[in-house]
Structure formats: C-alpha cells, structure tokens
C-alpha cells in the first residue's frame, strides 16, 4: 500500500516543485516511484553517476524527445546524485520505455489532426480520428511499484492510480485539471461519455494551436488554460469536482 500518491500537471513548473521535494521524500519514506521510463532510471544510476549534465541529457534523449527532457530535467539530473548520496534509498521508474522516434511519430500525427481541424474550425468536427489517436495500444495497465510514495504526472494517470492502487493519502502539486487532450484520452478509455468529444476536440485545437504554440513553455500554456473560462465551464459541466481546487497556494500540495 502506498503511503502517499502525488499528482501533478505535466509542466515545467510543477516538475520543478516536485524536484525540490524528492530528497525530503526519500529521507522520510525510503523509496518512491516516478513516472519516467524504467530503463532511463537504470541508465542514470549505472552510467550517470559522476557524469556531466551533457552526458545525463544524452542518456535521457535515448528515451525522451527534447520537450519531455526539458519538462523533467530538474528531476532527471538529480537522480544520479541522489542514488550516490542515499544508497539505502530507492528511486524506481515505472513507465514503459518508449523510443523518441515513436514519440515524434505521435507528435506528427497530432499536428496533422490539428491542421485539419483548424481548416474546419467553423464546420462540424469529426472527433473520431482524435479518439482513435488516444486509444491505448495495449490492453494491460502500467504496473505501479509497491513503494511508499508514488508520483503521477497528469490528471488521467493520477486518477487511474487512485482508482486501482491501495493508498492512504493523496495530494496534488499546484493546480491539476485535465487538459483538453486528456479529456479525449478519457473518452478513448471509456472514462468519459463520447457526447463531450466534439467540445474536447475544439478546446484541444485552441489549447495546441493558440496556447502551446503561442507560449514560451508548457507552464505558460497551462496557465492560459487555467484562465480559460469557457474551458473551465466545460469541466464543471462534466464533473463539478474536477475544477474545485483551482486556487491553491502555489508551492503547496493539496490533499484530495
């Protein structure tokens, strides 16, 4: 049973806040699980200890594309040092290994969907290709290690872990809501009714085409989403509980 499950949005600011908490969590609980590729953690411990930041980045790029490395960099670069300084503690990565080439291919598919949708922005959008994009490629679920602390990135993963694992306490870092893309993922997985699909696609187009492309990083794009009254109204229509914690103090975890 996990003593603590922590959920955070997949953005730079939230990961930086998590990075500041990892060492205290290790000292308090002894081990924790991170949503990073399994082999990345192994490589960071076996090959990363004593290496430069450039060598650690090169190891990371074996499993992540540059944008994901940027998001997780403050945590990734700490793992070799923590493994050296806390030999009796354990950091386990539980996500499946994915090659950067596969991530890039998915990015191209998503960009293609975005371009086609923007050309039809004033017409009825067919959400089926978007739902198909987010359908799981395997029937099995990710195996969560039996560690005292489990970190979950993204709203969907946080809720999946809370729904399948045994846990005592759950907290959120910063403000955690599903992005429009996660709404589509929830529809594809059967967690959300398909009647919300067309609105989810329209907000996905806005999120990607206006917020992500027009921002310096994902943190800024996410902040724009948090201030999008239309989108927040959609979330409240879907489930009033989703947007209930939109104003926590920055830097503090919130108990679910």
Tell me what each language-model feature is.
Residues 1-256:
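Compositional signal for N-terminal targeting/processing segments
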């Amino acid at each position: 049973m996990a003593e603590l499950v922590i959920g955070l949005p997949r953005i730079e600011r939230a990961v930086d806040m998590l990075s500041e908490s990892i060492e205290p969590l290790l000292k308090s609980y002894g081990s924790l699980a991170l949503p990073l590729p399994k082999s990345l953690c192994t490589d960071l411990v076996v090959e990363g200890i004593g290496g430069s930041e450039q060598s650690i980045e090169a190891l990371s790029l074996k499993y992540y594309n540059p944008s994901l490395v940027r998001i997780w960099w403050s945590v990734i670069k700490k793992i070799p040092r923590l493994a050296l300084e806390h030999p009796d503690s354990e950091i386990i990565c539980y996500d499946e290994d994915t090659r950067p080439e596969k991530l890039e291919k998915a990015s191209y598919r998503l960009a293609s969907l975005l371009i086609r949708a923007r050309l039809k922005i004033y017409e009825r959008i067919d959400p089926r290709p978007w739902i198909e994009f987010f359908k799981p490629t395997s029937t099995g679920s990710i195996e969560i290690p039996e560690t005292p602390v489990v970190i979950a990135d993204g709203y969907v993963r946080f809720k999946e872990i809370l729904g399948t694992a045994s846990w005592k306490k759950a907290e959120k870092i910063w403000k955690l809501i599903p992005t429009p893309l996660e709404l589509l993922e929830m529809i594809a997985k059967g967690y959300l009714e398909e009647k919300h699909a067309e609105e989810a696609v329209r907000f996905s187009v806005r999120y990607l085409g206006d917020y992500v492309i027009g921002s310096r990083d994902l943190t800024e794009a996410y902040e724009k989403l948090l201030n999008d009254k239309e989108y927040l109204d959609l979330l409240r229509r879907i489930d009033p509980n989703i947007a209930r914690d939109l104003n926590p103090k920055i830097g503090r975890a919130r108990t679910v």
